[in-house]
């Protein structure tokens, strides 16, 4: 039996080393994701929302043509739609980057 190993070739030391390496890669990826952004639009581009890789909204742009004081509800709906889609896009970006590191394993609580 190999040092640090178990019958059948399982080596706890290698497993710990791999986990530490994955942890370092995840930390690096989290830092990189802070710099990446995704955007979404609503109303044919009248409202644009931008989110970063931490699922934080970083900007909202509203075309002045969509602002109507007599129809605030439409503007509210457009903002909600753009923000929600931007956050979904950020989630997809994060999942895609995580899959590169974890090989597609779903590890709860990483983000």
From Swiss-Prot:
Lineage of the species this protein comes from: Bacteria, Bacillati, Bacillota, Clostridia, Thermoanaerobacterales
GO MF entry, a single one: DNA binding
Disulphide bonds in the chain: none
SUPFAM superfamilies per record: YbaB-like (SSF82607)
GO terms for cellular component: bacterial nucleoid; cytosol
UniProt organism field: Thermoanaerobacter pseudethanolicus (strain ATCC 33223 / 39E)
Protein name stated in the entry: Nucleoid-associated protein Teth39_2199
Family: Belongs to the YbaB/EbfC family.
Localization in the cell: Cytoplasm, Nucleoid
């Amino acid at each position: 039996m190999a040092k640090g190993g178990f019958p059948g070739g399982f080596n706890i030391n290698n497993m710990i080393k791999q986990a530490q390496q994955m942890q370092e890669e995840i930390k690096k990826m989290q830092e990189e994701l802070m710099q990446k952004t995704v955007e979404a639009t609503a109303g044919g581009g009248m409202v644009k929302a931008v989110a970063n890789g931490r699922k934080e909204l970083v900007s909202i742009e509203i075309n002045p043509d969509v602002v109507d004081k007599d129809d605030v509800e439409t503007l509210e709906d457009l903002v909600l739609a753009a923000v929600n889609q931007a956050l979904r896009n950020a989630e997809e970006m994060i999942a895609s980057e995580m899959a590169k590191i974890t090989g597609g394993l779903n590890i709860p609580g990483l983000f």
